[in-house]
A protein has these predicted regions:
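Generic C-terminal helix-cap and adjacent flexible tail
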Residues: 121-126
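Hydrophobic pocket-lining residues within nucleotide cofactor-binding pockets
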Residues: 27, 58, 82-83, 93, ...
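NUDIX/MutT-family hydrolases
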Residues: 77, 88-119
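N-terminal strand-loop-strand
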Residues: 1-21, 49, 53, 81-82
Length: 126
């Protein structure tokens, strides 16, 4: 969070293609959650952040029309402190920007993204 706004990206690939979400991705072998967050934010937005503590965790399981599992992710969202940079989309992000909690109402986002952002808002500004 920065100035009562949260960094969001418009996803360019599944899961959540076309939806706004917090930046994220896979944890590489030997990488901590904090290191993964810092790397993914840098890759997707160009921003430098310092990851802090987890605020939300959930399973994301997507199935095809026949009920076969297409994706199963364990998602852990962390708070992060902004260090420097301007949002610029890269990697699998189509857009990247700082968004106020009020403006989020007008953006397409998943239920879980909205829940994560509610928890972040309740924790207060950073």
């Amino acid at each position: 969070m920065r100035n009562h706004k949260v960094l969001l990206v418009k996803r360019g690939r599944p899961p959540g293609e076309g939806l706004w979400a917090v930046p994220g991705g896979r944890v590489k072998l030997g990488e901590t959650l904090q290191e993964a967050v810092e790397r993914e934010v840098r890759e997707e937005t160009g921003l430098i952040v310092r990851a802090r503590n987890p605020v939300y965790a959930f399973d994301l399981i997507e199935r095809d029309e026949e009920g076969r599992i297409q994706y199963h992710y364990v998602v852990v969202d962390l708070l992060a402190d902004y260090i420097k940079g301007q949002p610029s989309p890269d990697d699998d992000a189509l857009e990247a920007r700082w968004v106020s909690f009020e403006a989020l109402r007008d953006l397409p986002a998943s239920r879980t993204t909205r829940e994560v952002l509610r928890k972040m808002r309740d924790l207060g500004p950073t």
